[in-house]
């Protein structure tokens, strides 16, 4: 297998899942996907993903990055404040409610659980600090997402958008994300039985994300197929949004005197957004807006490609 395929199999898998599911007119793929979705398949996959993520997180390394208070605050500001604010200009464009909703879901997400840490290391940054940002951001997301998303939804001007109930969302995120993540971290520290499987957790996680996207696409296939003309505008929106977020991170790092070795974790972790949690909320709260799922998936593909170039740029920058 060529090295390029080995390195990019997840991105290729995302593209394949989207194409095969949307072109499945006989129900060969969508039938099983709909059955699994109706029988708590997504919940099981989500719990497994975050449990495995907890197994991988080496909490003993967090102390090494805990002293960088300025960098941590800068990254969290990018994740929870600046990212939602950067969606405001897009509300002035002639975008459909589904596209705006997808962008809002992306913007309120915490940082990724794995790729951001790896890319920070590849850029010459502090991986321990990136890990700290990951854990803090995903813990805070339980409380920030319901409030921020509720505010952004009020900007759509579409009365069909339901008002979300904040407490149920908090409980859902805590149950499906935070508790499995903590359980995995505890098992890692207290047991050695699963350590032989640690090298494979990243692959299993990515397979789980592909399964989540597949089940969600099965549910929203009809709505997506009927609105395929929005794909190019979505690519433009997701590219512009992530570019703006990365540039904001660079500006904050520059004026905050966060130099080389520290700025990488701020810029990369502040700009990356987890896919799986956005899929959870789209499937749970807005299944009728299938195009919102397309925004989440395309943003993930676009921002990983952009960040691969960003990693090289930051590594060579003094």
Predicted feature residues:
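Alpha-helical transmembrane segments of multi-pass small-molecule/ion transporters
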Residues: 1-318
């Amino acid at each position: 297998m060529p090295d390029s395929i080995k390195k990019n199999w997840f991105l290729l898998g995302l593209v394949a899942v989207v194409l095969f599911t949307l072109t499945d007119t006989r129900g060969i793929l969508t039938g099983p996907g709909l059955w699994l979705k109706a029988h708590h398949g997504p919940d099981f996959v989500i719990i497994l993903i975050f449990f495995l993520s907890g197994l991988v997180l080496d909490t003993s390394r967090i102390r090494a990055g805990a002293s960088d208070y300025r960098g941590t605050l800068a990254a969290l500001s990018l994740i929870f404040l600046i990212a939602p604010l950067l969606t405001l200009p897009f509300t002035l464009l002639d975008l459909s409610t589904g596209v705006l909703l997808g962008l809002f879901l992306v913007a309120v997400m915490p940082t990724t659980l794995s790729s951001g840490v790896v890319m920070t290391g590849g850029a010459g940054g502090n991986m321990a600090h990136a890990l700290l940002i990951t854990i803090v951001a995903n813990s805070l997301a339980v409380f920030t997402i319901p409030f921020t998303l509720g505010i952004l939804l009020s900007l759509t001007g579409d009365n069909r958008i339901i008002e979300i109930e904040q407490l149920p969302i908090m409980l859902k995120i805590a149950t499906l994300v935070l508790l499995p993540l903590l359980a995995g971290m505890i098992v890692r520290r207290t047991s050695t039985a699963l350590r032989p499987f640690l090298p494979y957790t990243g692959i299993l996680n990515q397979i789980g994300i592909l399964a989540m996207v597949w089940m969600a696409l099965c549910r929203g296939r009809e709505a997506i197929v009927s609105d395929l003309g929005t794909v190019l505008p979505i690519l433009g929106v997701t590219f512009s949004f992530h570019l703006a977020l990365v540039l904001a991170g660079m500006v904050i790092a520059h004026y905050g005197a966060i130099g080389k070795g520290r700025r990488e974790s701020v810029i990369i972790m502040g700009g990356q957004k987890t896919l799986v949690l956005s899929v959870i909320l789209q499937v749970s709260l807005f299944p009728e807006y299938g195009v919102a799922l397309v925004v989440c998936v395309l943003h993930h593909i676009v921002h990983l490609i952009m960040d691969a170039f960003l990693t090289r740029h930051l590594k060579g920058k003094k």
